[in-house]
């Protein structure tokens, strides 16, 4: 077994990052590559609470990882420059999403985790018309639907919904307006 020579030390960021989408993922299936880059978030609603008047700002950064077979992100709220030691736990988000293309189902398998808020979800994502829709469930089994809507090269509207106990009504719990920074 050969080892990585001392002069070839690689940090996790270098080993994780990829230059672009893997050729194994058809261009027509690339529902997330347009997100690559950094975004400023205007938080409108979080955990069902209307927070628009609080002017909470966040940030999100997206990039290809795992030899281009996945798109990973980090969502941060409040943004790093505004974080303090006494952050309100109900408004604290510092989590990551891993979206991996699965050719067997012709969709993306998605795992989200926010350790700051003890929140985890598994979803399946794909194009639905002009939107990207992710369906899945929280760790407690609550069905969820997350959507990227109003997509342009420089902006998107993100909606997070949870199915109510009646099994018919979707409640809007999260809403972010995003503008591209880079």
Model-derived regions, located:
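Hydrophobic small-molecule pocket/channel-lining residues, especially in calycin-type beta-barrels
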Residues: 1-182
């Amino acid at each position: 077994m050969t080892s990585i020579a001392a002069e070839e030390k690689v940090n996790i960021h270098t080993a994780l990052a990829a230059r672009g989408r893997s050729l194994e993922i058809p261009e027509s299936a690339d529902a997330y590559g347009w997100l690559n880059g950094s975004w400023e978030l205007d938080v409108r609603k979080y955990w069902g609470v209307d927070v628009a008047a609080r002017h909470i700002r966040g940030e999100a950064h997206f990039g290809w990882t795992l030899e281009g077979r996945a798109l990973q992100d980090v969502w941060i709220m409040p943004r790093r420059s505004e974080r303090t030691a006494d952050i309100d736990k109900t408004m604290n988000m510092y989590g990551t999403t891993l979206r991996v293309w699965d050719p067997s189902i012709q969709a993306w398998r998605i795992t989200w985790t926010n350790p700051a808020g003890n929140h985890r979800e598994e979803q399946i994502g794909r194009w639905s018309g002009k939107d990207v829709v992710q369906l899945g469930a929280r760790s407690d089994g609550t069905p969820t639907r997350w959507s990227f809507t109003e997509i342009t090269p420089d902006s998107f509207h993100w909606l997070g919904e949870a199915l109510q106990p009646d099994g018919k009504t979707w409640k809007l719990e999260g809403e972010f307006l995003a503008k591209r920074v880079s």
